[in-house]
Amino acid sequence: MSHPWPAGAATGLGSLPGTDPAEAVRLVLGELPELPYLPELPGRGFGADLIGRTGALLVDLPVEWQPHGWTVTSHSGRDQARARDHLNRDLDAVTEQAQGVPLLKVSVCGPMTLGAALELPNLHKVLTDHGAFRDLAGSLAEGARVLLAELGSRLPGTAVVLQVDEPGLPQVLAGQVPTPSGYGTVRALPRSVATPALTSVLEAAQPGHRVVHCCAAEVPYDLLADSGASAVSVDASLISDGQLDSIGELVEAGISLWLGVFPGTDADISASAARERIGRLWSKLG
């Protein structure tokens, strides 16, 4: 499988501190020229984080912020409009500064993680209703297509990579998502429902330009491969020896492995230490 990014390229995953989109885009373009990305700035307030930005993309599926979180509603209101305003400011910043960039990555929240975050009007998670969940996945897939098309028109000649963030996927598959009351958990989502939902979103991007990021332990590598991912991004510190065979099969199938080795916190790690961590893992893979 061919990929548009060069071997050994470094990139970021999404969120940055601060509230200025122009400054954030300048930083990313300067520090990560081989695979820059459209940053998220959750410090601007609700609607600017991963869930809010993705909610702004949903097509024909209004959502509103309620005291208990984002909820599917009958009509779009000011909360979704605010999230769209944040996204438009981000798009304007990258349009102004990224002309001529050969490659750009953009992230959306994946359908399983989004389904675990959004609630229906009856205060149950979207995951509890498979019909509503399929509607959500379809709306998200269409929204991702619209976003990629807009980036294509704003940045002619730039190839756009789609990163689908699924930090909650292992919990969803294991039936470990808490109910809104906190007294129970949501029934596990069958893989027969999860896999096509993820595939539909990934297919918004061109073949070879489809990435799934899962920063949790117990990553379902086989499901990600079956979904049509071109690359899988994981936290290197959470990889166990029991997962090495699955990772090896992934790599042998031509799927790119992206290893997160620099923490997204104030903790520091040198470039040499990061290389050593990658080298140790790669030697285990044989």
Question: Whereabouts are the PLM-identified features?
Answer:
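Conserved beta-strand positions in the central sheet of alpha/beta enzyme cores
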Residues: 36-39, 163, 232-233, 258
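Glycine-rich anion/phosphate-binding loops
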Residues: 79-95, 134-147, 272-281
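Glycine-rich tight-turn/loop motif centered on a GG-T
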Residues: 76-80, 121-138, 174-193, 230-233, ...
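Active-site loop segments of alpha/beta catalytic cores
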Residues: 139, 143-245
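Structural motif
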Residues: 13-17, 42, 109, 213-217, ...
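Short loop/turn segments at strand-loop or loop-helix junctions that form parts
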Residues: 106-120, 162-169, 260-264
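Catalytic-face loop-and-helix region of soluble metabolic enzyme cores
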Residues: 230-286
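Alpha/beta catalytic barrel-like cores
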Residues: 1-129, 223-228, 255, 284
